[in-house]
């Protein structure tokens, strides 16, 4: 079923992180000799590089390691905020990686790019799911799947690139619902793993170290997690406190970190101040309408 979904992809470019999901896709498409691209920050520590190189060697597929400078990343931040229309630091940090990968594909005159989107939601890959009690896990997986969204689609549309995600094929989505939660999250040896059924199914087809590699967010793998320390070091503490106070007084927005402040200032210059809605469904930090969610997609506040 997943092979069929991969084979139906028209693009011949893979966004490769060297994680489980993109490696499974590379395994199914290896006979095509697809082009793979990995985004790695030059100036920060990135964990994906070795794994991407291992996948490239294992499946004999060409790999471009696109090493991006801090200047490239700062430019990508502004473009990503412009497209996603939020200043959620975690979402921005992760999705500038995909912005840079999709931008690279466009520069190579590719019409599309293939991603591993969806596997973490459908097969319980997120770290916060791993330690959920058994009686809560199934409901939590269902909740995650009901609100899943993929900013890569917005980025691709903005850049004129088709984003194809084999795990989000309707047949796979429906099939994933029939898999018991104890096959999605389970112990293997002494460790508890999300996406257990995917790992077990493909452990003989892909490198073992990748099959059982712990979930690594894009921001860690590409190195953009280093942005937090960058902003902490370049923004003066006193200036931060002064700006934080002014923004809270004038805009009614509570800024939590220096990184968030940088993103908010870009967002505000582009889209202005968020209007406060009537009722109890507004985020207490930024006034965005969150309905019944504990997570604010606009500013990244959690729990609220």
Label for each model-derived stretch:
Residues 1-14, 104-110, 266, 270-278:
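Phosphate/ATP-binding catalytic cores across multiple sugar-kinase/actin-like superfamilies
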Residues 91-106:
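A conserved donor-nucleotide-binding helix/loop in the catalytic core
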Residues 49-84, 115-117, 122, 171:
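A conserved beta-strand->alpha-helix junction
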Residues 113, 118-134, 145-251, 275-279, ...:
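Mid-to-C-terminal catalytic subdomains of enzymes
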Residues 253-285:
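Short, charged low-complexity linear segments at domain edges
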Residues 25, 48, 93-97, 164, ...:
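Hydrophobic (often cysteine-bearing) scaffold residues that line and stabilize catalytic clefts
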């Amino acid at each position: 079923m997943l092979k069929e979904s991969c084979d139906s992809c028209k693009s011949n470019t893979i966004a490769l992180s060297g994680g489980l999901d993109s490696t499974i896709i590379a395994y199914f498409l290896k006979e095509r000799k697809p082009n793979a691209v990995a985004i790695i920050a030059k100036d920060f520590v990135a964990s994906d590089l070795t794994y991407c190189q291992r996948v490239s060697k294992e499946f004999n597929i060409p790999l471009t390691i696109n090493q991006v400078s801090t200047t490239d990343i700062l430019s990508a931040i502004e473009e990503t905020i412009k497209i996603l229309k939020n200043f959620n630091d975690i979402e921005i940090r992760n999705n500038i990686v995909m912005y840079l990968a999709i931008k690279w594909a466009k520069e190579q005159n590719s019409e599309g790019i293939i991603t591993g989107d969806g596997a973490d939601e459908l097969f319980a890959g997120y770290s916060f799911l791993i330690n959920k009690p058994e009686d809560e896990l199934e409901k939590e997986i269902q909740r995650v799947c009901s609100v899943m969204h993929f900013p890569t689609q917005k980025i691709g549309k903005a850049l004129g690139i088709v984003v194809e995600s084999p795990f989000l094929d309707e047949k796979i989505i429906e099939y994933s619902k029939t898999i018991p939660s104890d096959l999605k999250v389970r112990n293997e040896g002494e460790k508890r793993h999300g996406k257990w059924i995917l790992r077990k199914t493909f452990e003989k087809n892909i490198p073992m170290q990748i099959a059982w590699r712990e979930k690594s967010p894009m921001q860690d793998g590409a190195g953009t997690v280093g942005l937090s320390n960058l902003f902490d070091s370049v923004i003066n503490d006193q200036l931060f406190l002064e700006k934080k106070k002014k923004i809270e007084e004038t805009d009614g927005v509570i800024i939590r970190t220096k990184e968030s402040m940088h993103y908010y200032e870009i967002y505000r210059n582009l889209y202005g101040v968020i209007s406060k809605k009537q009722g109890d469904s507004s985020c207490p930090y930024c006034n965005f309408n969150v309905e019944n969610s504990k997570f604010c997609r606009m500013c990244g506040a959690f729990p609220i």
